[in-house]
């Protein structure tokens, strides 16, 4: 499923598609595959759902989100463009025109290189000053 925010990011969720079905999707629809900004990696990032290289190239995601899965089963791919929910916890996306500001419940130190720190963006705190979401970075789309 692909979702486009008006004047903003294009997201794709591939659910639990395993690699063979992804390859079939690519082979059947290769001329119609959209380029996207943020991909939720299929099958929670498990190796059994690893993206075929030709499909990944066609989609051209700027950022990949890997869902919760036991670490030994995850295919991290290019870890410089991924955020894993195992590390980040909950992830919140705030779309503002051509930027997506990303917040996570856990502070992450190994941030994807596609994210930059935007001046004025800060952690989100509750009324007692406790951080409830850490500002992780901004993706330009």
Whereabouts are the PLM-identified features?
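Binuclear metal-ion centers of metallo-dependent hydrolases, dominated by the metallo-beta-lactamase
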Residues: 63-141
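Active-site-proximal loop/helix segments of hydrolase catalytic cores
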Residues: 1-74
């Amino acid at each position: 499923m692909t979702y486009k925010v008006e004047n903003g990011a294009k997201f794709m969720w591939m659910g639990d598609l395993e690699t063979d079905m992804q390859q079939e999707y690519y082979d059947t629809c290769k001329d119609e595959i959209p380029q996207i900004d943020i991909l939720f990696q299929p099958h929670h990032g498990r190796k059994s759902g690893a993206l075929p290289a030709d499909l990944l190239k066609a989609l051209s995601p700027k950022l990949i989100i890997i869902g919760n899965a036991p670490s030994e089963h995850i295919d991290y791919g290019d870890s410089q463009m991924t955020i894993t929910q195992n590390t980040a916890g909950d992830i919140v996306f705030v779309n503002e025109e051509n930027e997506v500001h990303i917040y996570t419940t856990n502070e992450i130190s190994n941030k994807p290189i596609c994210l930059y720190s935007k001046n004025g963006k800060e952690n989100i705190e509750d009324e007692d000053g406790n951080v409830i979401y850490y500002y992780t970075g901004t993706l330009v789309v």
